Protein backbone atom coordinates (compact mmCIF):
# COMPACT_ATOMS: atom_id res chain seq x y z
CA UNK A 1 0.00 0.00 0.00
CA UNK A 2 1.04 3.59 -0.65
CA UNK A 3 0.39 6.21 2.00
CA UNK A 4 -1.73 9.12 0.69
CA UNK A 5 0.02 12.48 0.94
CA UNK A 6 -1.66 15.50 2.58
CA UNK A 7 -2.72 17.29 -0.62
CA UNK A 8 -4.35 14.14 -2.03
CA UNK A 9 -5.91 13.42 1.37
CA UNK A 10 -7.41 16.91 1.53
CA UNK A 11 -9.55 16.20 -1.55
CA UNK A 12 -11.05 13.23 0.30
CA UNK A 13 -11.59 14.99 3.62
CA UNK A 14 -13.13 18.08 2.04
CA UNK A 15 -15.61 16.20 -0.15
CA UNK A 16 -19.30 16.61 0.61
CA UNK A 17 -22.54 15.63 -1.11
CA UNK A 18 -22.88 19.20 -2.36
CA UNK A 19 -19.18 19.47 -3.22
CA UNK A 20 -17.86 16.50 -5.20
CA UNK A 21 -14.10 16.43 -5.63
CA UNK A 22 -13.86 14.41 -8.80
CA UNK A 23 -12.66 15.73 -12.14
CA UNK A 24 -14.37 14.94 -15.41
CA UNK A 25 -13.61 15.42 -19.07
CA UNK A 26 -15.14 14.23 -22.29
CA UNK A 27 -13.71 13.53 -25.72
CA UNK A 28 -15.88 13.37 -28.84
CA UNK A 29 -14.91 11.32 -31.88
CA UNK A 30 -16.24 10.97 -35.40
CA UNK A 31 -16.85 7.28 -35.99
CA UNK A 32 -14.70 5.61 -38.68
CA UNK A 33 -16.32 5.01 -42.05
CA UNK A 34 -18.28 1.77 -42.20
CA UNK A 35 -18.47 1.51 -38.38
CA UNK A 36 -21.40 3.80 -37.56
CA UNK A 37 -23.37 1.07 -35.76
CA UNK A 38 -20.57 -1.28 -34.68
CA UNK A 39 -17.96 1.08 -33.25
CA UNK A 40 -19.75 1.75 -29.94
CA UNK A 41 -20.45 -1.91 -29.06
CA UNK A 42 -16.90 -2.90 -30.07
CA UNK A 43 -15.43 -0.17 -27.88
CA UNK A 44 -17.66 -1.16 -24.95
CA UNK A 45 -16.67 -4.83 -25.26
CA UNK A 46 -12.96 -3.97 -25.44
CA UNK A 47 -13.19 -1.71 -22.40
CA UNK A 48 -15.13 -4.26 -20.32
CA UNK A 49 -12.39 -6.84 -20.95
CA UNK A 50 -9.45 -4.49 -20.38
CA UNK A 51 -7.18 -4.23 -17.35
CA UNK A 52 -6.49 -1.10 -15.34
CA UNK A 53 -2.96 0.11 -14.60
CA UNK A 54 -1.93 2.45 -11.80
CA UNK A 55 -3.33 4.71 -10.52
CA UNK A 56 -6.65 3.40 -11.85
CA UNK A 57 -6.22 0.16 -9.86
CA UNK A 58 -5.81 1.99 -6.55
CA UNK A 59 -8.63 1.75 -4.01
CA UNK A 60 -8.94 3.90 -0.92
CA UNK A 61 -8.16 2.21 2.40
CA UNK A 62 -8.54 4.14 5.65
CA UNK A 63 -5.86 3.39 8.25
CA UNK A 64 -7.34 5.73 10.85
CA UNK A 65 -9.55 8.79 11.16
CA UNK A 66 -7.21 11.03 9.17
CA UNK A 67 -4.79 8.52 7.66
CA UNK A 68 -5.33 6.65 4.41
CA UNK A 69 -3.47 4.67 1.78
CA UNK A 70 -3.92 3.40 -1.75
CA UNK A 71 -4.43 -0.36 -1.97
CA UNK A 72 -3.69 -2.04 -5.30
CA UNK A 73 -6.67 -4.13 -6.46
CA UNK A 74 -8.10 -5.64 -9.63
CA UNK A 75 -11.00 -3.36 -10.60
CA UNK A 76 -14.38 -4.76 -11.62
CA UNK A 77 -14.49 -3.37 -15.16
CA UNK A 78 -18.17 -4.26 -15.41
CA UNK A 79 -18.76 -1.63 -12.73
CA UNK A 80 -16.41 1.03 -14.07
CA UNK A 81 -17.43 0.97 -17.75
CA UNK A 82 -20.93 2.11 -18.77
CA UNK A 83 -22.49 2.35 -22.24
CA UNK A 84 -25.51 4.47 -23.09
CA UNK A 85 -27.08 6.01 -26.18
CA UNK A 86 -28.89 9.30 -26.60
CA UNK A 87 -32.42 9.18 -28.01
CA UNK A 88 -32.86 10.62 -31.50
CA UNK A 89 -31.89 13.13 -32.72
CA UNK A 90 -28.90 13.05 -30.33
CA UNK A 91 -28.38 16.81 -30.34
CA UNK A 92 -25.49 18.50 -28.58
CA UNK A 93 -27.97 19.98 -26.12
CA UNK A 94 -29.08 16.45 -25.22
CA UNK A 95 -25.45 15.42 -24.89
CA UNK A 96 -24.55 18.33 -22.61
CA UNK A 97 -27.60 17.71 -20.40
CA UNK A 98 -26.61 14.04 -20.11
CA UNK A 99 -23.01 14.90 -19.24
CA UNK A 100 -24.12 17.38 -16.57
CA UNK A 101 -26.39 14.75 -15.01
CA UNK A 102 -23.76 11.98 -15.07
CA UNK A 103 -21.20 14.26 -13.45
CA UNK A 104 -23.38 15.11 -10.44
CA UNK A 105 -23.05 11.95 -8.32
CA UNK A 106 -20.17 11.15 -5.97
CA UNK A 107 -17.75 8.37 -6.88
CA UNK A 108 -18.09 5.16 -4.86
CA UNK A 109 -15.16 4.84 -2.44
CA UNK A 110 -15.69 1.07 -2.30
CA UNK A 111 -14.13 0.89 -5.77
CA UNK A 112 -11.16 2.63 -7.39
CA UNK A 113 -12.57 6.11 -7.74
CA UNK A 114 -13.19 6.48 -11.44
CA UNK A 115 -15.96 5.81 -13.97
CA UNK A 116 -16.08 5.80 -17.75
CA UNK A 117 -19.19 6.41 -19.85
CA UNK A 118 -19.35 5.64 -23.57
CA UNK A 119 -22.06 7.93 -24.93
CA UNK A 120 -23.37 6.82 -28.32
CA UNK A 121 -26.00 8.23 -30.64
CA UNK A 122 -24.62 11.76 -30.95
CA UNK A 123 -25.65 13.62 -34.09
CA UNK A 124 -23.47 13.46 -37.21
CA UNK A 125 -22.32 9.94 -36.41
CA UNK A 126 -20.28 10.83 -33.35
CA UNK A 127 -19.48 9.09 -30.07
CA UNK A 128 -18.08 10.40 -26.79
CA UNK A 129 -16.11 9.12 -23.82
CA UNK A 130 -16.76 10.77 -20.45
CA UNK A 131 -14.18 10.01 -17.76
CA UNK A 132 -14.74 10.83 -14.07
CA UNK A 133 -11.71 10.51 -11.77
CA UNK A 134 -11.35 11.58 -8.15
CA UNK A 135 -8.91 14.44 -7.66
CA UNK A 136 -7.20 12.47 -4.88
CA UNK A 137 -6.27 9.79 -7.41
CA UNK A 138 -4.71 12.04 -10.04
CA UNK A 139 -4.27 15.76 -10.67
CA UNK A 140 -5.53 17.73 -13.65
CA UNK A 141 -2.34 17.54 -15.68
CA UNK A 142 -1.98 13.84 -14.94
CA UNK A 143 -5.57 13.31 -16.02
CA UNK A 144 -4.99 15.19 -19.25
CA UNK A 145 -1.87 13.11 -19.86
CA UNK A 146 -3.89 9.93 -19.30
CA UNK A 147 -6.46 11.13 -21.83
CA UNK A 148 -3.64 11.85 -24.28
CA UNK A 149 -1.84 8.53 -23.78
CA UNK A 150 -4.72 6.34 -24.93
CA UNK A 151 -4.99 8.15 -28.27
CA UNK A 152 -2.83 7.68 -31.35
CA UNK A 153 -1.49 10.19 -33.85
CA UNK A 154 -2.05 7.66 -36.64
CA UNK A 155 -5.45 7.08 -38.29
CA UNK A 156 -4.26 3.56 -39.14
CA UNK A 157 -3.82 2.47 -35.51
CA UNK A 158 -6.82 0.23 -34.73
CA UNK A 159 -6.13 -0.23 -31.01
CA UNK A 160 -9.24 0.23 -28.85
CA UNK A 161 -7.42 1.76 -25.89
CA UNK A 162 -8.67 3.51 -22.74
CA UNK A 163 -7.07 6.09 -20.41
CA UNK A 164 -6.70 3.52 -17.60
CA UNK A 165 -4.84 0.91 -19.67
CA UNK A 166 -1.38 2.44 -20.07
CA UNK A 167 0.56 2.73 -16.83
CA UNK A 168 1.18 6.29 -15.79
CA UNK A 169 4.56 5.22 -14.47
CA UNK A 170 5.63 3.87 -11.11
CA UNK A 171 4.70 6.13 -8.25
CA UNK A 172 7.81 7.85 -7.02
CA UNK A 173 8.43 7.58 -3.30
CA UNK A 174 7.09 10.65 -1.54
CA UNK A 175 7.63 11.39 2.09
CA UNK A 176 4.41 11.90 3.97
CA UNK A 177 4.30 14.59 6.66
CA UNK A 178 3.18 13.65 10.12
CA UNK A 179 -0.55 13.14 10.50
CA UNK A 180 -2.48 16.37 10.92
CA UNK A 181 -5.89 16.50 12.58
CA UNK A 182 -8.79 16.59 10.14
CA UNK A 183 -10.57 19.17 12.26
CA UNK A 184 -7.55 21.40 12.83
CA UNK A 185 -5.89 21.11 9.44
CA UNK A 186 -8.76 21.14 7.01
CA UNK A 187 -11.91 22.42 8.62
CA UNK A 188 -11.06 24.46 11.61
CA UNK A 189 -8.36 26.89 12.42
CA UNK A 190 -5.77 28.69 10.40
CA UNK A 191 -3.41 28.44 13.36
CA UNK A 192 -3.58 24.68 13.19
CA UNK A 193 -2.70 24.72 9.50
CA UNK A 194 0.32 26.93 10.05
CA UNK A 195 1.53 24.69 12.88
CA UNK A 196 1.05 21.70 10.62
CA UNK A 197 3.61 23.12 8.22
CA UNK A 198 6.26 22.91 10.92
CA UNK A 199 5.64 19.19 11.55
CA UNK A 200 7.14 17.95 8.33
CA UNK A 201 9.90 15.30 8.38
CA UNK A 202 13.09 16.45 10.02
CA UNK A 203 15.09 16.08 6.81
CA UNK A 204 13.10 18.88 5.16
CA UNK A 205 14.92 21.68 6.93
CA UNK A 206 13.89 24.50 4.60
CA UNK A 207 10.16 24.06 5.04
CA UNK A 208 9.98 25.43 8.58
CA UNK A 209 11.99 28.45 7.52
CA UNK A 210 9.65 29.05 4.60
CA UNK A 211 6.61 28.73 6.88
CA UNK A 212 8.12 31.21 9.32
CA UNK A 213 8.84 33.56 6.43
CA UNK A 214 5.19 33.43 5.33
CA UNK A 215 4.09 34.13 8.89
CA UNK A 216 6.35 37.16 9.11
CA UNK A 217 4.85 38.50 5.89
CA UNK A 218 1.33 37.96 7.23
CA UNK A 219 2.17 40.02 10.33
CA UNK A 220 3.77 42.75 8.16
CA UNK A 221 7.12 42.13 9.86
CA UNK A 222 8.80 41.95 6.44
CA UNK A 223 7.97 42.79 2.85
CA UNK A 224 5.43 40.54 1.17
CA UNK A 225 6.63 38.15 -1.51
CA UNK A 226 3.78 35.65 -1.21
CA UNK A 227 0.10 36.32 -1.72
CA UNK A 228 -1.66 35.70 1.56
CA UNK A 229 -5.10 34.25 2.35
CA UNK A 230 -8.21 36.22 3.38
CA UNK A 231 -7.32 39.33 1.35
CA UNK A 232 -9.77 39.07 -1.57
CA UNK A 233 -12.99 41.08 -1.82
CA UNK A 234 -16.13 38.92 -1.65
CA UNK A 235 -18.11 38.80 -4.93
CA UNK A 236 -20.93 36.84 -6.57
CA UNK A 237 -18.35 34.21 -7.48
CA UNK A 238 -17.90 33.39 -3.78
CA UNK A 239 -21.49 32.18 -3.47
CA UNK A 240 -20.89 28.53 -2.65
CA UNK A 241 -22.79 25.44 -3.77
CA UNK A 242 -25.89 24.39 -1.85
CA UNK A 243 -26.29 21.17 -3.84
CA UNK A 244 -24.36 18.99 -6.25
CA UNK A 245 -25.91 20.80 -9.23
CA UNK A 246 -23.36 22.50 -11.48
CA UNK A 247 -23.45 24.84 -14.47
CA UNK A 248 -20.92 24.37 -17.26
CA UNK A 249 -19.83 26.36 -20.27
CA UNK A 250 -17.11 26.11 -22.90
CA UNK A 251 -15.20 28.55 -25.07
CA UNK A 252 -12.79 27.75 -27.89
CA UNK A 253 -10.26 30.35 -29.02
CA UNK A 254 -7.94 29.88 -32.03
CA UNK A 255 -4.62 28.84 -30.50
CA UNK A 256 -2.62 30.53 -33.26
CA UNK A 257 -4.35 33.85 -32.53
CA UNK A 258 -3.71 33.53 -28.79
CA UNK A 259 -0.02 32.80 -29.41
CA UNK A 260 0.25 35.73 -31.83
CA UNK A 261 -1.28 38.05 -29.25
CA UNK A 262 1.10 36.82 -26.55
CA UNK A 263 4.10 37.32 -28.84
CA UNK A 264 3.00 40.82 -29.89
CA UNK A 265 2.62 41.94 -26.27
CA UNK A 266 5.68 40.20 -24.83
CA UNK A 267 3.56 38.10 -22.50
CA UNK A 268 2.51 34.44 -22.37
CA UNK A 269 -0.47 32.37 -23.51
CA UNK A 270 -1.34 31.95 -19.83
CA UNK A 271 -1.35 35.73 -19.32
CA UNK A 272 -3.55 36.33 -22.37
CA UNK A 273 -6.15 33.78 -21.30
CA UNK A 274 -6.16 35.05 -17.71
CA UNK A 275 -6.76 38.55 -19.07
CA UNK A 276 -9.70 37.32 -21.16
CA UNK A 277 -11.16 35.54 -18.13
CA UNK A 278 -10.61 38.50 -15.79
CA UNK A 279 -12.18 41.00 -18.19
CA UNK A 280 -15.21 38.75 -18.70
CA UNK A 281 -15.66 38.28 -14.95
CA UNK A 282 -15.71 42.04 -14.32
CA UNK A 283 -18.25 42.58 -17.11
CA UNK A 284 -20.39 39.75 -15.72
CA UNK A 285 -20.37 41.37 -12.28
CA UNK A 286 -21.28 44.74 -13.81
CA UNK A 287 -24.22 43.21 -15.67
CA UNK A 288 -25.50 41.84 -12.37
CA UNK A 289 -25.01 45.16 -10.51
CA UNK A 290 -22.31 43.53 -8.40
CA UNK A 291 -19.12 45.30 -9.48
CA UNK A 292 -16.08 45.27 -7.21
CA UNK A 293 -13.63 48.14 -6.68
CA UNK A 294 -10.65 45.84 -6.20
CA UNK A 295 -8.85 43.33 -8.43
CA UNK A 296 -10.20 39.80 -8.41
CA UNK A 297 -7.89 37.16 -6.94
CA UNK A 298 -7.27 33.85 -8.69
CA UNK A 299 -6.24 30.64 -6.94
CA UNK A 300 -3.85 29.08 -9.47
CA UNK A 301 -2.60 25.48 -9.19
CA UNK A 302 0.92 25.08 -10.59
CA UNK A 303 2.27 21.72 -11.68
CA UNK A 304 5.41 20.35 -10.01
CA UNK A 305 5.55 17.32 -12.31
CA UNK A 306 8.82 16.57 -14.01
CA UNK A 307 8.88 16.33 -17.80
CA UNK A 308 8.08 12.60 -17.73
CA UNK A 309 4.85 13.45 -15.90
CA UNK A 310 4.59 9.93 -14.53
CA UNK A 311 2.73 8.74 -11.47
CA UNK A 312 -0.65 9.32 -9.92
CA UNK A 313 -1.70 11.69 -7.19
CA UNK A 314 -1.28 15.45 -7.10
CA UNK A 315 2.12 17.04 -7.72
CA UNK A 316 1.15 20.64 -7.52
CA UNK A 317 1.77 23.87 -5.74
CA UNK A 318 -0.51 26.89 -5.88
CA UNK A 319 -0.48 30.66 -5.69
CA UNK A 320 -2.95 33.45 -5.10
CA UNK A 321 -2.65 35.86 -8.03
CA UNK A 322 -4.27 39.32 -7.96
CA UNK A 323 -5.46 40.13 -11.47
CA UNK A 324 -6.20 43.42 -13.25
CA UNK A 325 -7.79 46.59 -11.91
CA UNK A 326 -11.58 46.66 -12.45
CA UNK A 327 -11.47 49.64 -14.86
CA UNK A 328 -8.24 48.74 -16.66
CA UNK A 329 -8.15 48.69 -20.45
CA UNK A 330 -7.54 45.27 -22.06
CA UNK A 331 -3.81 45.87 -22.64
CA UNK A 332 -3.33 47.47 -19.21
CA UNK A 333 -5.07 44.45 -17.67
CA UNK A 334 -2.74 42.13 -19.58
CA UNK A 335 0.33 44.01 -18.32
CA UNK A 336 -0.89 43.90 -14.72
CA UNK A 337 -1.59 40.18 -14.91
CA UNK A 338 1.77 39.51 -16.55
CA UNK A 339 3.51 41.33 -13.69
CA UNK A 340 1.51 39.35 -11.10
CA UNK A 341 2.21 35.94 -12.66
CA UNK A 342 5.90 36.82 -13.04
CA UNK A 343 6.09 37.61 -9.31
CA UNK A 344 4.35 34.32 -8.51
CA UNK A 345 6.80 32.33 -10.64
CA UNK A 346 9.81 34.11 -9.14
CA UNK A 347 8.57 33.37 -5.63
CA UNK A 348 8.02 29.72 -6.48
CA UNK A 349 11.55 29.32 -7.82
CA UNK A 350 12.88 30.48 -4.47
CA UNK A 351 11.07 27.78 -2.47
CA UNK A 352 11.79 24.08 -2.09
CA UNK A 353 9.35 21.72 -3.80
CA UNK A 354 8.10 20.44 -0.46
CA UNK A 355 7.71 24.00 0.82
CA UNK A 356 5.65 24.87 -2.23
CA UNK A 357 3.38 21.87 -1.64
CA UNK A 358 2.99 22.85 2.02
CA UNK A 359 2.12 26.39 0.96
CA UNK A 360 -0.48 24.98 -1.47
CA UNK A 361 -1.99 22.98 1.40
CA UNK A 362 -2.18 26.16 3.49
CA UNK A 363 -3.95 28.01 0.68
CA UNK A 364 -6.34 25.11 0.06
CA UNK A 365 -7.11 25.04 3.77
CA UNK A 366 -7.74 28.78 3.73
CA UNK A 367 -10.43 28.29 1.07
CA UNK A 368 -12.11 25.74 3.31
CA UNK A 369 -11.93 27.98 6.38
CA UNK A 370 -13.60 30.80 4.47
CA UNK A 371 -16.31 28.40 3.34
CA UNK A 372 -16.97 27.06 6.86
CA UNK A 373 -16.74 30.13 9.09
CA UNK A 374 -19.13 33.05 8.44
CA UNK A 375 -16.65 35.68 9.66
CA UNK A 376 -13.79 34.58 7.43
CA UNK A 377 -16.27 33.89 4.64
CA UNK A 378 -16.52 37.67 4.30
CA UNK A 379 -12.78 37.74 3.56
CA UNK A 380 -12.24 34.95 1.01
CA UNK A 381 -8.79 33.93 -0.14
CA UNK A 382 -9.76 33.86 -3.83
CA UNK A 383 -12.67 34.66 -6.13
CA UNK A 384 -12.00 32.07 -8.81
CA UNK A 385 -9.80 29.05 -9.48
CA UNK A 386 -7.93 29.23 -12.81
CA UNK A 387 -5.94 26.25 -14.09
CA UNK A 388 -3.77 25.98 -17.19
CA UNK A 389 -2.93 22.57 -18.66
CA UNK A 390 -0.96 21.72 -21.78
CA UNK A 391 -2.77 19.45 -24.20
CA UNK A 392 -1.80 17.77 -27.49
CA UNK A 393 -1.17 19.93 -30.55
CA UNK A 394 -1.49 17.17 -33.17
CA UNK A 395 -4.59 15.47 -34.57
CA UNK A 396 -5.36 12.37 -32.49
CA UNK A 397 -7.39 9.23 -33.15
CA UNK A 398 -9.05 6.38 -31.28
CA UNK A 399 -8.92 3.23 -33.42
CA UNK A 400 -9.18 5.36 -36.55
CA UNK A 401 -11.86 7.69 -35.13
CA UNK A 402 -10.59 11.30 -35.23
CA UNK A 403 -10.87 13.40 -32.07
CA UNK A 404 -13.14 16.36 -32.87
CA UNK A 405 -13.82 17.90 -29.44
CA UNK A 406 -12.53 17.90 -25.86
CA UNK A 407 -13.79 19.63 -22.74
CA UNK A 408 -13.17 19.47 -19.03
CA UNK A 409 -15.84 19.81 -16.34
CA UNK A 410 -13.95 21.66 -13.58
CA UNK A 411 -14.39 21.05 -9.86
CA UNK A 412 -16.11 23.84 -7.93
CA UNK A 413 -13.77 24.55 -4.98
CA UNK A 414 -14.66 25.44 -1.38
CA UNK A 415 -14.76 29.16 -0.69
CA UNK A 416 -15.44 30.02 -4.33
CA UNK A 417 -18.20 28.98 -6.67
CA UNK A 418 -16.29 29.23 -9.95
CA UNK A 419 -13.50 27.25 -11.60
CA UNK A 420 -12.11 28.02 -15.07
CA UNK A 421 -9.73 25.52 -16.65
CA UNK A 422 -8.07 25.89 -20.04
CA UNK A 423 -5.96 23.61 -22.21
CA UNK A 424 -4.59 23.65 -25.75
CA UNK A 425 -6.09 20.88 -27.89
CA UNK A 426 -4.97 20.56 -31.52
CA UNK A 427 -5.41 24.06 -33.00
CA UNK A 428 -7.80 25.36 -30.34
CA UNK A 429 -7.43 26.73 -26.85
CA UNK A 430 -10.36 25.25 -24.92
CA UNK A 431 -11.68 27.12 -21.89
CA UNK A 432 -13.99 25.14 -19.58
CA UNK A 433 -16.22 26.90 -17.06
CA UNK A 434 -17.52 25.04 -14.01
CA UNK A 435 -19.68 26.85 -11.48
CA UNK A 436 -22.19 26.51 -8.72
CA UNK A 437 -25.46 27.93 -10.09
CA UNK A 438 -25.53 30.18 -7.02
CA UNK A 439 -22.35 31.84 -8.32
CA UNK A 440 -22.85 31.77 -12.11
CA UNK A 441 -26.26 30.74 -13.34
CA UNK A 442 -25.53 31.88 -16.91
CA UNK A 443 -22.28 30.22 -18.03
CA UNK A 444 -23.33 30.85 -21.64
CA UNK A 445 -23.23 34.59 -20.98
CA UNK A 446 -19.83 34.32 -19.30
CA UNK A 447 -18.60 32.40 -22.36
CA UNK A 448 -19.87 35.16 -24.65
CA UNK A 449 -18.09 37.78 -22.54
CA UNK A 450 -14.83 35.84 -22.84
CA UNK A 451 -15.18 35.83 -26.62
CA UNK A 452 -15.80 39.57 -26.60
CA UNK A 453 -12.87 40.22 -24.25
CA UNK A 454 -10.52 38.33 -26.57
CA UNK A 455 -11.65 40.34 -29.59
CA UNK A 456 -11.25 43.64 -27.72
CA UNK A 457 -7.77 42.64 -26.54
CA UNK A 458 -6.77 41.79 -30.10
CA UNK A 459 -8.10 45.12 -31.35
CA UNK A 460 -6.27 47.20 -28.76
CA UNK A 461 -3.05 45.21 -29.18
CA UNK A 462 -3.21 45.59 -32.96
CA UNK A 463 -3.33 41.91 -33.87
CA UNK A 464 -5.73 40.47 -36.42
CA UNK A 465 -8.03 37.46 -36.12
CA UNK A 466 -8.41 35.28 -39.23
CA UNK A 467 -10.58 32.83 -37.29
CA UNK A 468 -13.42 33.02 -34.80
CA UNK A 469 -14.03 31.56 -31.37
CA UNK A 470 -16.90 29.30 -30.36
CA UNK A 471 -18.82 28.81 -27.14
CA UNK A 472 -20.96 25.98 -25.82
CA UNK A 473 -22.96 25.47 -22.65
CA UNK A 474 -23.83 22.00 -21.32
Curated annotation (Swiss-Prot):
Task: Tell me what reaction this enzyme catalyses.
Answer: an acyl-CoA + a 1,2-diacyl-sn-glycerol = a triacyl-sn-glycerol + CoA; di-(9Z)-octadecenoylglycerol + (9Z)-octadecenoyl-CoA = 1,2,3-tri-(9Z-octadecenoyl)-glycerol + CoA
GO MF annotation terms: diacylglycerol O-acyltransferase activity; O-acyltransferase activity
What's any one GO cellular component for it? plasma membrane
Pathway recorded for this protein = Glycerolipid metabolism; triacylglycerol biosynthesis
Q: Which residues form the active site?
A: 135
pH dependency? Optimum pH is 6.5-7.2.
Q: State what this protein does.
A: Required for maintaining the appropriate mycolic acid composition and permeability of the envelope on its exposure to acidic pH. Upon expression in E.coli functions as a triacylglycerol synthase, making triacylglycerol (TG) from diolein and long-chain fatty acyl-CoA. Has very weak wax synthase activity, incorporating palmityl alcohol into wax esters in the presence of palmitoyl-CoA.
The protein depicted here goes by the name: Probable diacyglycerol O-acyltransferase Tgs4
Task: Please tell me the species this chain comes from.
Answer: Mycobacterium tuberculosis (strain ATCC 25618 / H37Rv)
Lineage of the species this protein comes from: Bacteria, Bacillati, Actinomycetota, Actinomycetes, Mycobacteriales
Amino acid sequence: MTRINPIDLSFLLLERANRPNHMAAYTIFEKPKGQKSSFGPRLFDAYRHSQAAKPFNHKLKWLGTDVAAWETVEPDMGYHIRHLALPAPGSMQQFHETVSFLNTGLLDRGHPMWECYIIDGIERGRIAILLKVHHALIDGEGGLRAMRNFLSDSPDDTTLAGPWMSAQGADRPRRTPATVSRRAQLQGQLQGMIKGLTKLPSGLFGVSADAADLGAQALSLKARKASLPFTARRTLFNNTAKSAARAYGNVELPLADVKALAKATGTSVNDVVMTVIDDALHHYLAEHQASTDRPLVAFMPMSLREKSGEGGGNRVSAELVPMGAPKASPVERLKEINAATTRAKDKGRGMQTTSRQAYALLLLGSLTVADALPLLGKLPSANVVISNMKGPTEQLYLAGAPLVAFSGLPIVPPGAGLNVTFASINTALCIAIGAAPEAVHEPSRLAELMQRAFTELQTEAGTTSPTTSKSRTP
